[in-house]
Amino acid sequence: HYPTHLWENERWFPLNNAYLYPHQPLPRDADPFDPSSYESYKRDDYAQDRLTEAALNFIKSNSEQPFFLYLAFAAPHAALQIPEDELNQYLHFEETPYTAQRNYLPHPTPRAARAAMISNIDSAVGRLMSLLSELGIDQDTLIIFSSDNGPTPEGGGDMQFFDSNGPFRGYKRDLYEGGIRMPTLARWPGRIEAGSSSSHVSAFWDLMPTLADLAGVEAPSNDGISFLPALLQEDQARHESLYWEFHNVRGSHSQAVRFFDSQNTSWKAVRIYNERTGLNPEIELFDLDSDPYETTNVSETYPELIMRAKQIMAQSRTRSFIDAWNFDFLPL
């Protein structure tokens, strides 16, 4: 989070940071409880704050006309990095220093760092919303906030301490709900009812058609489904199925599909192939309506749904030029 530069569209934007290799452990002869052991990992120009300032300036410069702003915070992704003065509010946590023997960078107070990184984003969003109000355009501005995937222990993230996933199974890189299920918040005064909620299930490929719908532009038919009707509590089209796959560098290949049966039950099928075992993996099946935390595999009870899941998995993808990312080795 202290890179040497950022990109603003096509413009290269230098930061006042010396290069810091992102994966280096604390030397084994260093004292992890000595603050001086971490001095070499510190930098000054925090990228998240630069992003926030750029967003604020953009809004000020475009407040007289409709605008689109995509603001992508990298935090709280590893490494654990935050300006020192923002740690103070969380230094009461009981801590074990993270020495980064596995990955990313060490930190003397990893729990405080992660909490402060999240609070930094919270503060930034608050500043953006306050500016919209000051400029008198908050009532005309739709704000959508979401994230990309579930939590991970990489880089010293303590998922158990923060209860990052609640009851959901899996983490980042898993295709269980804990890896891919993310809440999405939307605020649009006078258009979206405050405090309302929707059970509509969308995926990131629905964002572009939603934005196109807002702009009055027709999106290509292969780019998902607009969820604008769900935001406005109108009749919403739904996906007949949603498909995911993930290829781990450690030789694990995962597929998942979510679909409905004739009774409108929401099902989720997950298949994980491990190159090291070379076995034909079982497809797990979960009834997400009664088992949203994916605790009970009911694949043996519904063989017809397993066949349907296999067909959707095969039909939902095209071949990759990287052979390892195909699933030719699996029977239909």
Model-identified regions with their sequence ranges:
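Short, surface-exposed beta-strand/loop micro-motifs that present aromatic residues
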Residues: F58, H253-E275
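Basic phosphate/pyrophosphate-binding loop/patch that engages nucleotide-derived ligands
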Residues: S133, L232-H239
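Charge-dense polyanion-binding interfaces
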Residues: A309-P331
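Short Gly/Pro-enriched turn/cap motifs at secondary-structure boundaries
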Residues: K172-E177, Y243-V249, S254-A256
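Generic alpha-helical structural context detector
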Residues: A186, P209-D213, L228-L232, Q255, ...
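Active-site-proximal cap/lid insertion segments
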Residues: H1-W205, A212-N222, R271-N280, D289-T295, ...
